[in-house]
Amino acid sequence: PLDTWGPNSAFERLFQTRTVAWHTAHAPSFALRADRGELQKTGEDLAPIAPALLAAFRITSDELNEIRALHLQRGATLQLDLAGLSAVARVVLLARALQLRVDQLAALGRLVAPDADPFRVADPAATQRFVALVRELMASDFTPERLAYLLRHEDAKRSQSPATAQVGALLSTI
């Protein structure tokens, strides 16, 4: 999970900022218990704090939806707890480290063998294999989208309508 210890912890740098506080009417959403091991108030879904997550991670609602879908494909639902926030952070950090968009990372994640799944719990070797595969791909003429199309017949067309989180964020600011 995200480091929660001290004023310079990853949790504090992400969620205890004015930008995040401005995007959520629920400031207690990011309050930690006294032992700092979990949020004071957990929930079943990240939707109520989606605008704050978009601000904290500097991602779009499409990217947040892609992250949710990525975890659903692995049988996990992202909940409003430290584990859910950490799961979002892992995807965002890996995508940025590999200089990929979240949708590209997700597409490549669907193409690799299970032993190279970067989101396998407690398996850094799988992440290393994934990183090596991505670097090999980036050195080629293939893009993640082309490879997904060739191997899985996935089309990278995006919906032109706004995502639910975008509509909710806009309505909450009105």
Predicted feature residues:
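Hydrophobic/aromatic interaction determinants used to assemble and anchor large protein complexes
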Residues: 1-174
